[in-house]
Every structure is written in C-alpha cells, then in structure tokens.
Design a protein with these regions (language model features):
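N-terminal amphipathic/basic leader segments beginning at the initiator methionine
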Residues: 2-32
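Glycine-rich phosphate/diphosphate-binding loop of Rossmann-like nucleotide-binding domains
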Residues: 24-71, 264-267, 271
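Glycine-rich beta-strand-to-loop/alpha-helix junction loops that act as flexible
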Residues: 35-37, 94-102, 187-188, 259-261
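Structural motif
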Residues: 70-81
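Proline/glycine-rich low-complexity loops and linkers
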Residues: 74-75, 88, 105-207
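Short, structured active-site "lid" loops
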Residues: 81-94
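An accessory alpha-helical subdomain
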Residues: 178-276
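Conserved short beta-strand edge segments in small beta-sheet-based binding/regulatory domains
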Residues: 276-287
C-alpha cells in the first residue's frame, strides 16, 4: 500500500512536499517489481510490496520505486532493464510469477534480462522431489512423481549468487549480481516471501544499511496549505531531512513526517514545526 492510500489523497498542487526524497537519504536504494495479472487487475492486494517497503526502510535500504506489472515476458524484461540502468538503485526485489503454471514466467524473463541461460538447479529439484513425495504419502497428491510444472520452479537463470531455501513452498528465492546491483527474485506467496526474507535474505545480505530516523506530528482539522511556507523554508535550511505532509480526509488528520539519517537534525526539524504551528494556533501530537 502506498502512503497516499494509507493516509488519504493529496491536496492538488501541494501534494507531498519534501526537502529530499527519503530514498536520497541512504547510500542504498531499492526498487520493487511486483509481478502478476492478479495485482494489476485489482483482484489481489499487493501486500508484498507494502511489507517489503517497510522492512527495507527500517533496514536502511529505502525504496525509490514500486512497480506492478503483468505476467508478460516483454514487460518484465523491460522493467528489469530499467531498474538495472538506474544509477540510484542498488537493490532490486522481484516478487511473483515463480509457480508451476504456464503464466509463471518470471525466471525465464529474468534470464533474458540478464542475458543468461536457464538451468535446472539440482539442489532445488531434489528438495522439490522430497516435498512431492511427502505430500503423496500424506494423501495430498495422487502421484509421487515430479511433474513438468514442478520442474519449472527448479529451472532458474544460470550463475546465481545465492539460492535461498523455501521452507514453506517449492519455488526458491534466488539472488543475482549484475551491473553492480543485487537482484533478489522471490516467490509471490506472502508467507513464502516473508520467510525467505526474514530467515535468510535479511541477515545475510542486508546488514550494511543505515536506517533513517522517523518522527511524526499529527494535527487534527489542520489545513495542509498553511504549512506550505514553512515546508519550503525547511527545504532550504534542512536539505538532509525529508519532510512530507500526508492528509487523511476520513480521520481529519494531517500527518507531518520527517525522515533523516541524523536523529538530532530530525528532532530539530520537528521542534521547528511544533513551534511554528503553535504560533498559528495548531498543536501537533508526536508519534
């Protein structure tokens, strides 16, 4: 879910003002590519991207861009090449399209984008065979034989930097290095994606980030436009702190959110906003 979905629409012409995009605060920046017709068709909520964006922000790998695209190879390849060509993006997270059916085309598309062949990853195939056999013994499958659909999940782009175990499903998570970037290809099933991320990916490959400090002030029945002069002033005086305004027209709240690497600078900005808004007769609640 994007911030404007969580807190309501933005004021036309004012929108989300900031001294710097939060992605610009970190030396690492991420991009998320969510793949699936069910996402862009409005059938399934893209909870994976929302969860990933929050985790990455907390770990110091803030997200520059989230893109949802269809299960179309040419569109997947095009988007991946866009992320690889972006000099600001250091980490790319791809989710979805790793299943056993013909419309699961992510591995093949990643291989094309990276200019690599697809290979059967033997460790993954062996794990799939064991899982299918156990499911047959439990009466969940009629046959203990691995199908072509099962094998699709073991056919990955060649030369992975790391292959993650999926303890909750069959499709593996895979990491690649290309053009100085790290690309993580993860299952679209939320339970599987989160398991791989928290148990292996995060502790092994995301320990070098520096998380931003986040502070908020919440105002009730405040008019967003009244903050415009102050936020423009802060933009000039505190270029290292991102300041954004987020109105929620359902709760009648206006959230002023500040992000920065230096906690003292962020607190200083919050105090300026608190003091100046009080002079205008508005009191913000700290969060």
């Amino acid at each position: 879910m994007r911030d404007d979905e969580a807190t309501g629409p933005l004021t036309p012409g004012l929108g989300r003002m900031g001294s710097k995009d939060p992605a610009g605060i970190s030396r690492y920046n991420s991009a998320i590519v969510a793949i699936g017709d069910e996402l862009v068709g409005g059938f399934t909520l893209d909870s994976n991207s929302h969860w990933l964006a929050e985790r990455l922000r907390l770990l110091g790998y803030p997200v520059k861009r989230i893109t949802a695209i269809r299960d179309r190879p040419e569109e997947i390849v095009e988007q991946l090449r866009r992320e690889l060509s972006d000099p600001e993006v250091t980490h790319v997270f791809v989710s979805g399209g790793l299943g056993p059916t013909p419309d699961d085309r992510t591995f093949a598309s990643v291989a094309q984008a990276l200019g690599r062949e697809q290979v059967i990853w033997e460790e993954t195939r062996a794990r799939i065979e064991r899982r299918v056999r156990r499911m047959h013994e439990a009466g969940l499958l009629e046959s203990p034989d691995v199908t072509e659909g099962n094998l699709r999940m073991a056919r990955i782009p060649a030369e992975p930097a790391h292959v993650f175990k999926n303890r909750r499903g069959m499709a593996p998570g895979v990491m690649y290095e290309a053009d100085g970037k790290s690309i993580f290809v993860l299952p679209g099933v939320p339970l599987e994606m989160k398991g791989i991320f928290t148990e292996e990916l995060e502790p092994q490959f995301l320990s070098g980030g520096s998380a931003a400090t986040v502070r908020e002030l919440r105002f009730t029945f405040a008019v967003e436009a009244r903050f415009y002069p102050l936020m423009r002033e802060l933009e000039e005086k505190y270029p290292d702190v991102s300041v954004g305004s987020y109105p929620n027209f359902e709760t009648k709240e206006l959230v002023i959110r500040c992000l920065g690497k230096d906690p003292k600078r962020v607190d200083e900005v919050i105090e300026v906003i608190r003091r100046r808004s009080a002079e205008l007769g508005m009191t913000g609640e700290a969060r």
